[in-house]
Amino acid sequence: GLEAESPVEAVVRLTLNEQPRDAFVAACMVMHSLSGFDRFNLGDSREKCEHIRRDMLAQLGRCPNHSGYLRAQALIKAADGGCDNVFEASVLWIIKSLYSGRVVTQYPIIIGDNTYFGDIVLPDLKIIVEPDGRTKFGDNEQEVRENTGKWLSRQHDLANAGWRVIRARWHDTDD
């Protein structure tokens, strides 16, 4: 049969040889996919991601003399399976490149009877970074109208609780 590399092997190859952002995004997406990440079951999802990370690091351990070894190790350690898509992973890459404090994906914020999940959160600063995608609002006019109302209510609740929400658009990741 045709021999192919596993997703974990592919991530290790990418982290060793490709551009750091692209490799980081790939590592996040593989973790997300293989873990079946579910924000409503964060403990189990994060545990599965850590198992996948250990597999990636073990695979990387087979290449200790590669010139990109230390960079690959850092990328794998920084990857996060809580990113739902390539855009979120790209934004996370930028944040982790600029900020050394705690960064958490799919961070639950409880306000009254509501639980909101911040896509990318700097909890110590009470900052939520939300990569904006049109798909979050729906596929037709009625869904967009309903979801826009929910979004405005969410924004109001978060702001009143002292959270600052920063919106990121795809073109913000170009540089």
Where would I find each of the regions flagged by the language model?
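Surface segments flanking catalytic/ligand-binding clefts of nucleic-acid enzymes
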Residues: 45-175
